[in-house]
């Protein structure tokens, strides 16, 4: 799953909430464009900027109430502006990985790798 999204990120940007989320994805070898939302602009202005520049994006906000709210708002605005929004990774992590924030992904990934090594 992660390998697939690393490849996908080489041509499609990922939207995250903050700089720490960006750093976490970099630790997981996501080297494509990652766009940080928390820059002091509104969701609608941010969505306008995104829709003017991209035809497809991946959303990876946190998995708490705020992150879920942002995901839903971005999805609504961006799809309404003709942008394809990929939520598969967000939904997969929310359902299968016991974390609440994107920042926790590297540590969780490391734990999973260690489990596999011990088997």
Swiss-Prot record:
Sorted UniProt keywords: Magnesium, Metal-binding
PROSITE patterns named among the record's database cross-references: TOPRIM (PS50880)
Required cofactor names: Mg(2+)
Toprim domain location: 11-93
Entry's cofactor comment: Binds two Mg(2+) per subunit.
InterPro entries associated with the record: TOPRIM_dom, TOPRIM_RNase_M5-like, UPF0292
Binding site for Mg(2+) 1: 17, 62
Record-linked Pfam families: Toprim
Domain of life the protein comes from: Archaea
Entry binding sites for Mg(2+) 2: 62, 64
GO molecular function, one term: metal ion binding
UniProt key word Metal-binding: yes
Record-stated family: Belongs to the UPF0292 family.
Matching HAMAP family: UPF0292
PANTHER family registered for this protein in UniProt: UPF0292 PROTEIN MJ1624, UPF0292 PROTEIN TK1411
Name the record gives this protein: UPF0292 protein TV1259
Organism classification: Archaea, Methanobacteriati, Thermoplasmatota, Thermoplasmata, Thermoplasmatales
């Amino acid at each position: 799953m992660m390998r697939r999204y690393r490849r996908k990120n080489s041509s499609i940007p990922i939207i995250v909430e903050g700089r720490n989320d960006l750093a976490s994805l970099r630790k997981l070898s996501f080297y494509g464009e990652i766009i940080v939302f928390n820059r002091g602009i509104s969701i609608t202005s941010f969505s306008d900027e995104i829709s003017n520049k991209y035809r497809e994006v991946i959303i990876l906000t946190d998995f708490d109430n705020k992150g879920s709210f942002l995901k839903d708002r971005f999805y609504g605005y961006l799809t309404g502006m003709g942008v394809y929004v990929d939520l598969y990774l967000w939904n997969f992590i929310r359902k299968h990985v016991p974390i609440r924030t994107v920042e926790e992904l590297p540590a969780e990934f490391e734990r999973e790798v260690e489990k596999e090594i011990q088997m």
